[in-house]
Amino acid sequence: RRLAAASPNPQQGLDFFAIRDNTLNAFALPGGYIGVHTGLILAAESESELASVLGHEIAHVTQRHIAQLVGKQSQAGMVMLASVLVAILAARSNSQVAEAALAAGQAGALQSQLSFSRDMEHEADRVGLQTLEGAGFDVRGMPSFFERLQRAGRLYESNAPVYVRTHPLTTARIADMDNRVAQMRYRQV
C-alpha cells in the first residue's frame, strides 16, 4: 500500500499476485496486475529490495508502458507492411533488392522495439526508485538487488550485444541507480 500511495498515480488500481516459480522474475500486465515469482521473493534479503522490484513494476503500470508497447508494435507492423510492399514492387525487377527491402524492414522494426523496451526499463527504474523513496523504503535496496541479480547471472546479463537486448545491462542499471541514490537524502520510515 505504501508503494502504491507513493506512486505517480496513487489512484491506479493495482492487484499483486505470486506465482510459485523458483526463477527471479516479476512482471506487470494490463489493468494493473503485477505478478511476482516466489523465487524473487525468496531472493530478496530485505523488504526494501523486494519493494524496489514492486516499485519498478508499479512504474510500468503508472507510466502506461504496456499500452505504449502495443502502440509501438502497431507502428512496427506498419513499417513491416511498407517493407513488404516495397519488396513486392522491387521483386518485379530485382529479387535481391526485394530481399534487402524485406530484411531492412524487419531489422528496423525489431531494433525500434528493442530500443523502446530498454528505454521503458530505464524509466521504470527511475520512477520505481522515486516511488521507493516516497514510500520511505531504503533506496539502496534497488542497486543492492540489481547486484544480487548480476551475481546470480540469472537475469539480464548474457553475451548478447546491447542492441539486441530488451533490458539494459545490469551493470549499467546498477551504476545509474547508485548515482541516483547518492544524490538522495537517506531516510527510512
Role assignments for model-derived ranges:
Residues V36, S52-H60, R64-H65, A124:
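Active-site recognition of the HExxH zinc-binding catalytic motif
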Residues F16, G108-V189:
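Extracytoplasmic and endomembrane cell-envelope/extracellular-matrix remodeling and assembly machinery
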Residues S48, I58-Q75, S93:
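Catalytic Zn2+-binding segment of zinc metalloproteases
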Residues G35-S52, L114-D119:
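Short pre-active-site segment immediately N-terminal to the catalytic Zn-binding motif
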Residues G77-S93, A100-L110:
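Membrane-active amphipathic alpha-helices enriched in small hydrophobic residues
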Residues V70-M78, V97-A100, G136-F146:
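Acidic/histidine metal-binding catalytic segments
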Residues R1-N9, A43:
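A metal-dependent hydrolase signature that marks the N-terminal structural subdomain at the beginning
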Residues A18-G32:
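Catalytic zinc-binding patch centered on the HExxH motif and its immediate surroundings
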